[in-house]
Amino acid sequence: MALLPRALGVGAAPSLRRAARALTCAMASPGEPQPPAPDTSSFDYLVIGGGSGGLASARRAAELGARAAVVESHKLGGTCVNVGCVPKKVMWNTAVHSEFMHDHVDYGFQSCEGKFSWHVIKQKRDAYVSRLNTIYQNNLTKSHIEIIHGYATFADGPRPTVEVNGKKFTAPHILIATGGVPTVPHESQIPGASLGITSDGFFQLEDLPSRSVIVGAGYIAVEIAGILSALGSKTSLMIRHDKVLRNFDSLISSNCTEELENAGVEVLKFTQVKEVKKTSSGLELQVVTSVPGRKPTTTMIPDVDCLLWAIGRDPNSKGLNLNKVGIQTDEKGHILVDEFQNTNVKGVYAVGDVCGKALLTPVAIAAGRKLAHRLFECKQDSKLDYDNIPTVVFSHPPIGTVGLTEDEAVHKYGKDNVKIYSTAFTPMYHAVTTRKTKCVMKMVCANKEEKVVGIHMQGIGCDEMLQGFAVAVKMGATKADFDNTVAIHPTSSEELVTLR
């Protein structure tokens, strides 16, 4: 600090000290920084993408004294706020209300034949999202972060430079946090594929579809199929194999498939769309079912109002002109980074879905903040630990999972060193209801001390109960630690501390 102005010493205001520290950290990077071109605006930190990860990193950097800017071409908040987690959770809550209405009579209430209005919930949902957009805008303004509206592409310059609407911007530290986009089949693969929509289009629907076909077996497909079915749409879920969520623990994969079918979703197994045609009564799908050991059969699904592709997500990196600065990607376009979120180009970083690892909003936020602390607070070891990240699927009933699946644990520790505890029961909520859902739980333990390395569950309340158990797994709790915890009765969560 001796080389800094006297005003930035011990007695300086916190904001000035933070700015000085940020400047010191930025200057501490190895290599000789090149001055920007005369027609280029310069910042300490330039973030491409105004989604959860980018905004979290920019705001944390600003708190630490960096002069930051965010480039965003659309609405602030990214996928999560606009076409993901937030509006999805509103629709899931709506679907849960619909399910509970079926149980009112069993709980002693007079028959409730409430008529559902898609228009009402859509209007309220969209208004809520709009309020969040405004909050994000205000937060950036309060943090003195400049917002640059437009599409960013890397351009020529003495150091990594970004061009937006004909203007150039640069910084010693540039973060790419552009997220991902839904995958859509190419017309050459499936003629008429463009007649379908994606999860983005789901939030643009003006009416509840009468007949829906969801294609995909991942969590997005499962969630949307469950929502539409619960709200009254005749729904089919088309999957290539015989189970959904095949990357999850086998217990969850099997049980979720069963619960979907019990809830009235038609699960079309070993089935794929071959062609889509538009008719006077909607869409007509030609599908092929190829059950192993049997001859493939072709059938038609007529009068489809909503065909929704939920077959994965692609990195939103195509328009960035990454080759201009030589940033390396994989074959799908995911930006390659190391454990500290560094790309192969000095001073350029990436977080979130564009990297293709753990596509979850809290992961992008945590990684972005850790990066800001490393760059502007001199915390050189600041990085996100990607192990034991908890996740929830808002299915019906919801799924909670953290840590290793049984198969992953066996692969890591050996079959003889893994012990499984599991249970299945009917939640007390259903003690008096005609409608039933199960709750299933599995605890994966490793080695002699029976360290808990994985917890997987599906049932009412599993979404909310997971967070606390995830802390225990992250801290290295053992089965004995769970056993020594007094149960809360009567709850579903007590099952995890009474497993035998």
UniProtKB/Swiss-Prot annotation:
Annotated residues that bind NADP(+) are located at 217, 220, 223, 240, 246, 312, 359, 392
What range is the organelle transit peptide?
Answer: 1-26
Catalyzed chemical reaction(s): 2 glutathione + NADP(+) = glutathione disulfide + NADPH + H(+)
For the modification N6-acetyllysine, the affected residues are: 75
Amino-acid positions noted as binding glutathione in the UniProt annotation, renumbered to this chain: 52, 59, 136, 369
- Cofactor notes: Binds 1 FAD per subunit.
Q: Anything further noted?
A: The active site is a redox-active disulfide bond.
Give the NCBIfam families listed for this entry: gluta_reduc_1, PRK06116.1
What name appears for this protein in its UniProt entry?
Glutathione reductase, mitochondrial
Gene encoding this chain? Answer: Gsr
